C-alpha cells in the first residue's frame, strides 16, 4: 500500500454529508442547498433520449483517448466559444470529471525525485492537495483572505519554494470562494 495515503485528509464532502444527515429543514421554506456541488436537476429529456438511442455504445469500453467525434465536437465548441483552435487528436482528452483530470495531470507532471512543490490557493478544491501528496510533492498553500480580495497572492511565495515548484493550480472562478481573477490578476 502506498504510505502516502496516510497523509491525506478525509474528503470534505463525506464529512459534510455526515454533518447534514438528519438535518431538519423548515417546512415553510424551500431552501436552496449550496453545500455540495452536484446536479440539482434531472437530465433533460433530449439527453435521456440520446443516451437511450445510443446505448449500444455503452456495451464496450470507449477508446482510451475518447471518441474522435466527441473530441471534435469539444474542439468546435471551444473554437466557437473562445476563438481558440485546438487539435482534437492531440490536445483534447475527455475525462469523467475534473477530479480525474486534475489527479492524472498531477501524476504525469510531477517528478518526485526533485523535491517538488505544488502551489495551490487556500481554500482549495480538495483534489489539489491529495494529487500533490500522492505524486510525492509538498503542497504549498497560498492564502486567499479578505486582505487579498480572496485572490491568491503569488508574489508572496518564497523564492526557494518557487524554484522547486513544478505545478501551480489556479481556478477562476475559484472553487469554493467564487472569486474571479481579472486580466490584470493573470498578468501578475
Language model regions located:
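N-terminal small-domain helix-loop-helix segment of the aminotransferase-like
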Residues: 6-97
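Conserved core of the PLP fold type I
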Residues: 58-188
Amino acid at each position: 500500500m502506498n504510505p502516502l495515503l496516510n497523509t491525506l485528509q478525509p474528503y470534505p464532502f463525506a464529512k459534510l454529508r455526515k454533518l447534514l444527515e438528519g438535518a431538519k429543514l423548515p417546512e415553510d421554506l424551500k431552501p436552496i442547498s449550496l453545500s455540495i456541488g452536484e446536479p440539482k436537476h434531472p437530465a433533460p429529456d433530449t439527453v435521456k433520449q440520446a443516451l437511450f438511442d445510443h446505448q449500444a455504445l455503452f456495451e464496450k469500453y470507449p477508446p482510451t483517448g475518447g471518441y474522435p467525434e466527441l473530441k471534435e465536437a469539444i474542439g468546435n465548441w471551444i473554437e466557437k466559444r473562445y476563438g481558440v483552435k485546438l487539435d482534437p487528436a492531440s490536445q483534447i482528452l475527455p475525462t469523467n470529471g475534473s477530479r480525474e483530470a486534475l489527479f492524472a495531470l498531477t501524476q504525469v507532471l510531477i517528478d518526485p525525485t526533485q523535491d517538488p512543490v505544488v502551489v495551490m490557493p487556500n481554500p482549495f478544491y480538495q483534489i489539489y492537495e491529495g494529487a500533490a501528496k500522492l505524486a510525492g510533492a509538498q503542497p504549498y498553500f497560498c492564502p486567499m483572505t479578505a486582505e487579498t480580495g480572496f485572490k491568491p497572492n503569488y508574489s508572496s511565495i518564497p523564492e526557494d519554494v518557487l524554484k522547486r515548484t513544478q505545478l501551480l493550480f489556479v481556478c477562476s472562478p475559484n472553487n469554493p470562494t467564487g472569486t474571479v481573477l481579472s486580466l490584470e490578476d493573470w498578468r501578475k
